[in-house]
Amino acid sequence: HIMPLLAAVEESEEIKGLLILLNTVGGDVEAGLGIAELIAGMKKPTVSLVLGGGHSIGVPLAVAASKSFIAPSAAMTIHPVRLNGVVIGVPQTYNYFARIQERIVSFVTGHSNVSQEMYTKLMMQTDEIANDVGSVIYGEEAVDCGLIDSIGTLSDALDYLHERMN
């Protein structure tokens, strides 16, 4: 029920900004993109801080804020869209996944400084994760490639937010 809460934050005259603390292994793509779109569309100042992990759909959530920070020890996993279980209609499912992946890549590259080429390269890497495709990047790497704005702590994120709220 986070979406109605984000709408309430945006409408509230008492709330001047939003701090998003992320520590997630990922989850539902549709829900994550919906939440990320809400955050990205807010007029109030927003700041995200990745702590521990901002994996999978946590990446769009992290870059949705107007400013993103990552702890030096935090990690982010970038990978293609996945599915477990029985697949009926393989070509159709593949096409559907390709379209979902395009939405994610477009959102991430549109709300960060990482290029589409770099993000796709990280997503399709085959020598990073055992028996899988993708990359795990850590604090400084996420900043160096343009995915996250800055290395930072809770104090850094709050300082940024307070500056924007005044």
Please identify what each model-predicted range represents.
Residues 1-59, 63-79, 83-166:
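N-terminal organellar transit peptides
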